Amino acid sequence: MIRPLFATALAALVLVPLCARAEDEPPVPATITFVVSSGFWEELPDAEDDAEEATAPQAARRGYYKLVAERQPDGTALVHLQQIEATPDGPKIASSTVLEEFSALKPYVTDIRPENSAGITIQPGLFATVYLKTDPAVAEPESWTVLIDDLGDIKVERATN
């Protein structure tokens, strides 16, 4: 009698944490349809800051860009641009913004692709193509480019092929 009761209690102790984990939020929300990490950015410390803190020189901040398409309840998407900083503790979001140029179109995003998939870029910045439809019934998507130059200026425009 005690042995089956003990086995049941032990099974409950093992299964309760598993059930709790199943109810936790997923690591990537279901509304995220596309994510592309590409390009890179770097911020050098200001010379004025170095003069004030001569005993502790600051390292340059570095990282990469991420474009994220997030599906909205009406089926259209928001396109987020994030700067991800590479830190000793791992990546962290340095900045995040919704690209209003896409929001104004109320797009149905069908794909996002980086300039190259090698993972290596020579110049700082980002070049990626967002494929979208403004009417879901249209067969072919439009191509839009997101360009960030070496100074950090962002340009979103329809691709010209």
Predicted regions: what is each one?
Residues 7-17:
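Bacterial N-terminal signal peptides
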Residues 21-161:
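Exposed acidic/polar residues on beta-strands and adjacent loops within beta-sheet cores, strongest
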Residues 1-4:
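Positively charged n-region of N-terminal signal peptides that target proteins for export
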